[in-house]
UniProtKB/Swiss-Prot annotation:
Protein name: Photosystem I reaction center subunit IX
Family that this chain belongs to: Belongs to the PsaJ family.
Gene responsible for this protein: psaJ
Lineage, top ranks: Eukaryota, Viridiplantae, Streptophyta, Embryophyta, Tracheophyta
Any one cellular-component term (Gene Ontology): chloroplast thylakoid membrane
Any GO BP annotation: photosynthesis
Superkingdom, natural source: Eukaryota
Amino acid sequence: MRDLKTYLSTAPVLSTIWFGSLAGLLIEINRLFPDALTFPFFN
């Protein structure tokens, strides 16, 4: 039962950190490359 409580207390924390860092990464990519649908340097 203690392991279950440990899992339930760490999984939300880890997922919050993961999704927060992923959102920050996407925000910074969109800040550096504003229109990600067209990359002019690939043409």
